[in-house]
Amino acid sequence: MTYTGKSIKRLNDDKFITGRSNYIDDIKIPSLYAGFVRSPYPHAIIKRIDATDALKVNGIVAVFSGKDINPMLKGGVGVLSAYVNPSLFRFKERKAFPEDNKVKYVGEPVAIVIGQDKYAVRDAIDRVNVEYEQLKPVIKMEDAEKDEVIVHDELKTNVSYKIPFKAGDIEKAFSQADKVVKVEAINERLIPNPMEPRGILSVYDGNSLSVWYSTQVPHFARSEFARIFGIPETKIRVAMPDVGGAFGSKVHIMAEELAVIASSILLRRPVRWTATRSEEMLASEARSNVFTGEVAVKKDGTVLGIKGKLLLDLGAYLTLTAGIQPTIIPVMIPGPYKVRDLEIESTAVYTTTPPITMYRGASRPEATYIIERIMSTVADELGLDDVTIRERNLIDQLPYTNPFGLRYDTGDYIRVFKDGVAKLEYNELRKWAQQERSKGHRVGVGLAFYLEICSFGPWEYGEIKVDNKGNVLVITGTTPHGQGTETAIAQIVADALQIPIEKIRVVWGDTDIVEGSFGTYGSRSLTIGGSAALKVAERVLDKMKRAAASYFNADVQEIRYENEEFSVKNDPSKKASWDEIASLATTKEPIVEKIYYENDVTFPYGVHVAVVEVDDLGMARVVEYRAYDDIGKVINPALAEAQIHGGGVQGVGQALYEKAIINENGQLSVTYADYYVPTAVEAPRFISYFADKSHPSNYPTGTKGVGEAALIVGPAAIIRAIEDAVGARFTKTPTPPEEIYKAIMSKK
């Protein structure tokens, strides 16, 4: 049986649907519980912390603050240098508590309370008395850029990063323009909402440190813990149990995790902490940027040049991946289009708000929203339709190096765009919408095209072990946490070894078992991790063939292998099963192969269409979402389609509902009463296809990545659909009902 290309059911779902999963809170190790005293102010000096009353609470073991924990740390959390050049940013590594005794956002931890049960800890938190001297906050990016209120005194400015991205001759492009079109694209601050909040359990025995951690990057976490705490990596184990979602937010190491580990070291006792939903919403936020610019165009819709300013909010601290936004968004703004002349000033600033982290798409949604806003706005200004403007500007030959040096790999953008428009029946939907509007029904259809960068390297680890019964253990450096990647990897290995998938087990996420790992994020897992597994499977099969040759006393070139059976080409009577050769081979030496597989990034792309209804009060609802994607070779169509559906629902959230509301006093609403996340009720009907003539990547798997596609392009398609329904221009995600209502009323 061939497994690749088939919708094989996920291999590990039984434990999740029967309640046998094992999350951080399920780990049965007797431990102390931690909780945090947090700042009620966005900007203030800590004058005094008095834990006297808290320590009187029955069951409370300790209360630690910065003076107790920060001196233990050899460093703090910095930036992910694999993708971000730290020298380009002004920043200070973040320790467990503010080193300057100055809080910089509402909810910043100022002390950790340790107790025998979580309820005592919650009581004690309220009895820690903290005296503050309030300072003036700076909430808006535009105000922070003025440097009138400085967030980090030692940096002497709020501007962490300011780089002009220039390509071609922008002045020449604008001098040749028939028209200059102004464009604005706003991505509001939003909050990743995995079902399981962050959690950690730290055990220190005086010699070694064991950490169970809800993370996407266990090996990176181990390296950082070793650096920060001065403990050799060989003495640290980081284990990733089942993780209830992440969406990029669990790539980060936050201050709370450092405090929990430090407390377990100080007390020589296990300490655990799981964030409440409010704490999760305070700690993990994303997006928050504004693009304002001008576009030079010809009358026929040809885009000659783009210039503008990208202003990004970092929040109070530069987190591990926040630096990706100001560096990747500008270079991805050209997208799949031929524009060669650009000048984008990218500026990232600190504000007294919760730090910005990573969220599904991580810079690609912003870049896509900007370039698709440009295309749609130019189309409106020139009286062109959305199909014509894109066809006129799409890259027509690949591979292609974009103006900032990114090499787009394989594909046919124009053909896939045309095929997608036809397959998704976009033109037919437009006619239907016009007919419905003539009847008084406010409906709209929006289209957007995307190109994303995926499969970030620089490498991924793969290892395979074959036991004496022929069973195969695949050890992957990827870290699945809901995507089903382990099933797809098993499919790849089963086909490579020509054995039943039931003989394969895939493991990940434990630094004591997995030699190396970069983790799961950026739609990289199946492409680079699956390719590592495929290459190492080929090595294993070669070793098994050599074992068979030895058994048959034949040359290895004479060995034929097919459907679990080894035989000699010129003597078919000599044959043995996979299991038999495995049994013989492992008596002498184990069958083990490993690889650190390296390759370059990939660029999947596609066209998505949204259909919306808008009522008289401005409430928009996405009723149908259609997708046509070229993601290279599709290993498991059901898993790939599930990623489109999940990303599409999150795209609905970003386009219509999700905005972290921070008032002028820095107070953030941290409940679902104020932060709306789409549920199954708001989910649209999905129709999704993968390109009839796909273009495989240069990876052994031929895959490109699909995990973020729909959230990358969805907001642009949905906002365009609202514009079609209402007949007005909108610039931001989310576009709230009150703005839609104002536009409706202005038409009357």
From Swiss-Prot:
Main location class: cytoplasm
pH-related activity note: Optimum pH is 6.7. At pH 6.7, glyceraldehyde is the predominant substrate, however at pH 7.5 the dehydrogenase exhibits activity preferentially towards the aliphatic aldehydes such as formaldehyde, acetaldehyde and propionaldehyde.
Group of enzyme by EC: oxidoreductase
Binding site for Mo-molybdopterin guanine dinucleotide: F247, R360, G522
Compartment(s): Cytoplasm
Domain of life: Archaea
SMART domains associated with the record: Ald_Xan_dh_C
Free-text remark on how the cofactor is bound: Binds 1 Mo-molybdopterin guanine dinucleotide (Mo-MGD) cofactor per subunit.
Reactions catalysed, as given in the entry: D-glyceraldehyde + A + H2O = (R)-glycerate + AH2 + H(+)
Needed co-factor(s): Mo-molybdopterin guanine dinucleotide
EC id: 1.2.99.8
GO MF term list: glyceraldehyde oxidoreductase activity; iron ion binding; molybdopterin cofactor binding; oxidoreductase activity, acting on the aldehyde or oxo group of donors
Function summary: Component of the glyceraldehyde dehydrogenase which is involved the nonphosphorylated Entner-Doudoroff pathway. Catalyzes the oxidation of D-glyceraldehyde to yield glycerate. When the artificial electron acceptor 2,6-dichlorophenol-indophenol (Cl2Ind) is used, the enzyme shows a broad substrate range (glyceraldehyde-3-phosphate, formaldehyde, acetaldehyde, propionaldehyde and isobutyraldehyde), but is most active with D-glyceraldehyde. It is not known which acceptor is utilized in vivo.
Family designation: Belongs to the xanthine dehydrogenase family.
Protein name: Glyceraldehyde dehydrogenase large chain
